[in-house]
Amino acid sequence: MDDGNDDAITPGGDDAGNNPFAGMPLFGDLSRALSGQGPLNWDAARQFALLAASGGDMAGAMTPGGKVLVPTGNIEPNVRIKYAELAGIARLHVADVMQLTVIESDPEVATPEQWAAQTLDAYRPLFNDMATSLGQTSDDDGSNDPMMQMMAGLSKMMAPAMMGMSVGSMVGGLARRAFGVYDLPIPREGGFASKLVVVPPTIDNFAAASDIELDEMRLWVIAHEMAGHTLLSIPHIADHLRSLVQRHVGAFRPDSSAMT
């Protein structure tokens, strides 16, 4: 009699040898839930990114529907206006030094949480490539030991969630230190490629801690962001950098000998 469960969790299914919960419908459902988003669990990545970016305040960070909410207060309108004013000065300087066309739009402002969410989306293909390469297994990793087979299956099941936690924590940690998009000199694609984004709370805190006049700090950050955007908007430079990063993340391999 067909109980409605697919072959992945029944004895004799194609993955039965690698699934530690084969033949156990309840745990099979858990297995699919943990790995249901592919090589990286993006729900976990977003939640851990917001947790790290907000310094541990996850209250209200995620709704039951998964919509990202921002715990930190919005940036004041006068701060947005100030960055727009300074952008004109920075634009003239960067254009004069680089002798290239500089982006005309004013910089957007973001909280660390918003920066983290945007960065996860912008680099999603790279993180997926990295998770895929780390999730690969070689033929010589097999073992006739049932316990080793079960542990290997358990590790494979948990890998997407663990990768999501690791990636999210890393991006969230960076969000608390980043001044803008081009702190990471990695080209972004799609709609993210045309944006300048600065993080006023982090900039303000650094200026205060380093005893730097706030407008001077803001001007430096805007000039840095415009220079990075101008350079990485050159197609052959952006394509080459992107290919180098993709090659690097695609070359990762898991080391089973490290688990001894």
Model-inferred region functions:
Residues M1-D129:
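N-terminal low-structure segments adjacent to metalloprotease catalytic domains
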Residues Q47-M58, L69, G142, M148-S155, ...:
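A Zn2+-metalloprotease active-site environment signal
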Residues T72, E76-R80, N144-D145, F179, ...:
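Short, structured coil/loop segments at alpha-helix boundaries
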Residues Y83-P201:
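Auxiliary, metal-adjacent structural segments of Zn-dependent hydrolase domains
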Residues G164, G168-Y182, L231-T260:
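Post-HExxH zinc-binding segment in Zn-dependent metallohydrolases
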Residues I203-V221:
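Short pre-active-site segment immediately N-terminal to the catalytic Zn-binding motif
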Residues M217-S233:
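Active-site recognition of the HExxH zinc-binding catalytic motif
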